[in-house]
């Protein structure tokens, strides 16, 4: 009977984790460059004889690789990335990756995010431009030109998020594994004058949220019933002495 409680508890913990990720996804359905968090669950077998009992793992989080819709803005300092790559930014918590390409220039010409975090080049250094040196043009390879002269290169990075990651400021993420600059990949490029919208389908996520909430309530009710049955069994056994 206790085994049933353990199985229900493992299911409840897994469902709670999925509820939290769904709620976070929905909250960021309008966040530029946001990538949804998904959860993969595995079946864990308990070595109980004479039969094996299946438990639900707590779940492993991973980032959705689906690209969000592209929105044309026409701004010279708005950028979207084509393909599986990220911009690198220097946050107070350390370097982070983002697909939110809403950039601007400081008074000194440093390229920063709308929150003021420096945007980094392929070498991990801040990008310095001249705000008064003419039109800014950025090629698909990330090369930044002013008056026909290349003066900087937007850093594009790839990372293995399967080794773990943490969120930073909604659309930014910090992978556990060291990101590497993108080299010789023709499927990756920069699009100037565009932004990538969140890849969250709010309607789909809401539907899943309702389903998971119902499942969570059902498991909770099952646990209460199991606990009640266990109490009655203990009471009966105790009274038979």
From Swiss-Prot:
SUPFAM superfamilies: Flagellar hook protein flgE. GO terms for cellular component: bacterial-type flagellum basal body, rod. The keyword Metal-binding does not apply. InterPro entries: Flag_bb_rod_N, Flagellar_FlgE/F/G, Flg_bb/hook_C_dom, FlgE/F/G-like, FlgF, LlgE_F_G-like_D1. Keywords: Bacterial flagellum. It comes from the Bacteria. It is found in: Bacterial flagellum basal body. GO terms for biological process: bacterial-type flagellum-dependent swarming motility. Belongs to the flagella basal body rod proteins family. The basal body constitutes a major portion of the flagellar organelle and consists of five rings (E,L,P,S, and M) mounted on a central rod. The rod consists of about 26 subunits of FlgG in the distal portion, and FlgB, FlgC and FlgF are thought to build up the proximal portion of the rod with about 6 subunits each. This is Flagellar basal-body rod protein FlgF. It comes from Rhizobium meliloti (strain 1021).
């Amino acid at each position: 009977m206790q085994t049933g409680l353990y199985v229900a508890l493992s299911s409840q913990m897994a469902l709670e984790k999925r509820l939290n990720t769904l709620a976070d996804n929905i909250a960021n359905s309008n966040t530029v460059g946001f990538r949804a968090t998904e959860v993969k669950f595995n079946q864990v077998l308990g070595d109980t004889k004479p039969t094996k009992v299946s438990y639900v793992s707590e779940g492993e989080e991973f980032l959705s690789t689906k690209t969000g819709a592209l929105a044309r803005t026409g701004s010279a300092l708005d950028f979207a990335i084509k393909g599986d790559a990220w911009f690198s930014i220097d946050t107070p918590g350390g370097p982070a990756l983002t697909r939110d390409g809403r950039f601007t220039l400081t008074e000194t010409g440093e390229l920063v995010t709308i929150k003021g975090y420096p945007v980094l080049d392929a070498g991990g250094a801040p990008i310095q431009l001249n705000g008064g040196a003419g039109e800014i043009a950025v090629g698909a390879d990330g090369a930044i030109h002013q008056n026909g002269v290349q003066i900087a290169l937007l850093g594009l990075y790839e990372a293995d998020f399967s080794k773990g990651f943490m969120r930073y400021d909604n659309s930014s993420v910090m992978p556990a594994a060291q990101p590497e600059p993108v080299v010789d990949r023709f499927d990756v490029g920069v699009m100037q004058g565009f932004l990538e919208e969140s890849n969250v389908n709010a309607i789909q996520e809401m539907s899943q949220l309702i389903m998971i909430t119902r499942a969570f309530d059902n498991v909770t009710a099952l646990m209460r019933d199991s606990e009640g049955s266990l109490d009655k069994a203990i009471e009966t056994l105790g009274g038979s002495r």
